[in-house]
Amino acid sequence: MIAMDIREIGLRLVGEAIKAADPYRAVLNAVKVSDDKIIVQGKEFEIKGKVYVIALGKAACEMARAIEDILDVEDGVAVTKYGYGKELKRIKVIEAGHPIPDEKSILGAKEALSILNRARENDIVFILISGGGSALFELPEEGISLEDLKLTTDLLLKSGAKIHEINTVRKHISKVKGGKLAKMIKGTGIVLIISDVVGDNLEAIASGPTVKDPTTFEDAKRILELYDIWEKVPESVRLHIERGLRGEVEETLKEDLPNVHNFLIASNSISCEAIAREAQRLGFKAYIMTTTLEGEAKDAGLFIGSIVQEIAERGRPFEPPVVLVFGGETTVTIEGKGGKGGPNQEIALSATRKISDLEALIVAFDTDGTDGPTDAAGGIVDGTTYKKLREKGIDVEKVLKEHNSYEALKKVGGLLFTGPTGTNVNSIVIAIVTSKRGRT
């Protein structure tokens, strides 16, 4: 094992995770150009005509910049969140609304359709998708206004409908979701996707504009009725769904298209693998425990802490030195007035109760660099943190109950700061155990 401070090791592994999810780097790693061929993850595409780019999501500009740097781009559009825009050589940049779509979201989609209309059968169209694309890139179906679409989404959000149910309805009142964008590609579509969805379900990322969709107009109506909002949504939405049920409006994409190829180029899983590789290079055994971690943050922290305790005290299920990696997205349920913090800060703080006095470190962070509504990416704690908190008179149980993890961790140097990373592949927890208790 390389002689390094445990905190230094933790920070290095965080860096590897973020590097693996960097949009610019991810595109360059995935796409190679050789003579008159484009090679993506081993699949070859012949360059016979022009190259166009349509990028949508928070990482749109960085992904588009990478394509511009390796190919001669004829034209393109990048639709991203306000404040995320960067000037590109040939590609037009449009900043739009997120998480609520606005007129610029529609403008971005119209620009994209204009490009698809110009692209011929021998051309290549790159579609670059990242988190936030669902709101940033929108074009309601005929007869449905942006306000109607926003009201429908708002009613669904307030009804308690699950995210996949909300997306089912949205796909059936949008011209670009549920594989409908793919239907408009006449040439070769090369789709590069950065996943911000736990489990990497491509249908769920930006509401799946380029992948087949199993849901139907029947499902959309059933969901609106189930949550008792069928009569509350705008008449234009009801009429469109009724037309779909009668077969007068085309369904979402039901079969993969032979000319459209989807590639996952960055995800929580890919970042977790990068951590494991670097940990092994540093002399640790490394295990990816899950990439679908969900549930209440403080419970996840206690559970991860208890695994670390078992390893450090009994050498099971793994002997130290070892690195465990957990990917996913946990939540914080706030009742009453919450304090300052985020799910990853709660994971770290909660884990301190289990790893006190152990040769161990836990770092929990959001890969976008922002954990909850704070300037911290997450929390970083070790075997000394719990004692330091007690010495400062901080009651961990009370702080967790009040959801005030930021202030508690701040007092003991337990906050992790990365700054905005320009990417998002959800959250990651890294647990490092260097030796068993009583051993150095």
From Swiss-Prot:
Optimum temperature is 45 degrees Celsius. It has strong activity at moderate temperature 30-50 degrees Celsius and about half of the maximal activity is retained at 100 degrees Celsius. One of its GO terms (molecular function) is ATP binding. SUPFAM superfamilies: GckA/TtuD-like. Keywords: ATP-binding, Kinase, Nucleotide-binding, Transferase. It catalyses: (R)-glycerate + ATP = (2R)-2-phosphoglycerate + ADP + H(+). Coiled coil: none annotated. Its EC number is 2.7.1.165. Its cofactor is Mg(2+); Ni(2+); Mn(2+); Co(2+). The keyword Nucleotide-binding applies. Homodimer. Catalyzes the ATP-dependent phosphorylation of D-glycerate to 2-phosphoglycerate. It can also utilize GTP, CTP, UTP, ADP or pyrophosphate as phosphate donor. This is Glycerate 2-kinase.
